[in-house]
Amino acid sequence: MDIIDIKTYMHSIGREARAASRLIAKAETAAKNRALTQMAVAIKRDEQQLLAANARDVENAKERGLEAAMIDRLTLTPKSVASMAEGLLQIAALADPVGEISDLNYRPSGIQVGKMRVPLGVIGIIYEARPNVTADAAGLCLKAGNAAILRGGSEAIYSNQAIAACVREGLKTAGLPETAIQVIETTDRAAVGELVTMKEFVDVIVPRGGKGLIERISNEARIPVIKHLDGVCHIYIDEEADQEKAIRVADNAKTQRYGTCNTLETLLVHENIAGEVLPPLCRIYLDKGVELRGDPASQAIIPEMKEAREEDWYTEYLAPVLSVRVVSSLDQAIEHITIYGSQHTDSIITENYSNARRFLREVDSSSVMVNASTRFADGFEYGLGAEIGISTDKLHARGPVGLEGLTSQKFIVLGDGHIRQ
């Protein structure tokens, strides 16, 4: 397609999504749940077609010389297809937030004032080589009463088209407009540029992917964006930490999975406990193949540690690499997190109630924890069900974004002929 055709194509999708959003916003919970259930049925039934489409994508990715990690994210298996279907059923089982009324109170005038939860409208979701996001995003947006325009990575085009066919079937079976969930069929990057500027059709953009993608979307979008750029997560081991807890939590936070945005990237340790806790903890890291980069005080305790450079403190490694720093106080730990952190997830290990309270209050991140692994920063673990992503912004949603984060609120006023005096 040329630029004019892309614009025409995207505006057509946008108009259809806007029209569908009005119908989805008032759809009954039972209809939405039926659509989700039928999507899951179609995905299970069409497993072989989905795997065949995915095999084409994987073969093309290998021919293009894409990284092994990307190919791994791209690849579907019978287990991951079953997981997609199960995810849709789990979304169907979640409470419907749309229409929920809260904070309803009588005012002195006699009127009642409250808030009602309402859909956002049309959500544009841009993601890379993760076909499962097509099903997850479709399910979450639908349950929250929104229409969605999905733009997956070009490397997953055949997989996304196959999953989208199952999504459309579910919508049609439930009597809902098939245009409520649309997958952009072109791999032309100009479509992304058009999507993030169609403010007359799209209400919010959710990018999911690497830093380069999210920076591009943030810079080009003329529509609100729900995002996080980096996951530079910290654990601070306080001088009053239980050492056994500290070692167990810090080990899990780093080594359970290396490539997630809630993985520990920088470990801060109080100088009064560093000599006791770092040797056994770092032995665990080194035995698991984690490269350690530390400040001079850390290196003095662990000779195998490499020297940390200034850029290390800012880095989300997404790899078996960890920065380590010895600090003199809770104040210095909080200052370090303030300067180098990404406002994603940070945790303190301590038995001191006052220090825990200060850390919770003063660390300005979307998730702040006490005596818990940063790996818990996840919508499912928080009881939100599935999540569309994690936001480190302070406006509209913050932290893991589940169904409620895909809605807004409006004020409702109930009277009985009341007039203002």
From Swiss-Prot:
GO cellular component, one term: cytoplasm
UniProt cross-references to PROSITE patterns, sorted A to Z: PROA
Catalytic function, reaction form: L-glutamate 5-semialdehyde + phosphate + NADP(+) = L-glutamyl 5-phosphate + NADPH + H(+)
Highest taxon in the source lineage: Bacteria
Database matches in Pfam families: Aldedh
InterPro entries: Ald_DH/histidinol_DH, Ald_DH_C, Ald_DH_N, Aldehyde_DH_dom, G-glutamylP_reductase_CS, Glu-5-SA_DH, GPR_dom
Alphabetic keyword roster: Amino-acid biosynthesis, Cytoplasm, NADP, Oxidoreductase, Proline biosynthesis
CDD domains found in the cross-reference section: ALDH_F18-19_ProA-GPR (cd07079)
Compartment annotation: Cytoplasm
GO molecular function: glutamate-5-semialdehyde dehydrogenase activity; NADP binding
Functional pathway: Amino-acid biosynthesis; L-proline biosynthesis; L-glutamate 5-semialdehyde from L-glutamate: step 2/2
Gene Ontology BP terms: L-proline biosynthetic process
Enzyme Commission numbers on file: 1.2.1.41
Major subcellular location class: cytoplasm
PANTHER family named in the record: DELTA-1-PYRROLINE-5-CARBOXYLATE SYNTHASE, GLUTAMATE SEMIALDEHYDE DEHYDROGENASE
Similarity section: Belongs to the gamma-glutamyl phosphate reductase family.
Functional summary from the UniProt entry: Catalyzes the NADPH-dependent reduction of L-glutamate 5-phosphate into L-glutamate 5-semialdehyde and phosphate. The product spontaneously undergoes cyclization to form 1-pyrroline-5-carboxylate.
Protein name: Gamma-glutamyl phosphate reductase
Species this protein is from: Nitrosospira multiformis (strain ATCC 25196 / NCIMB 11849 / C 71)
Gene: proA
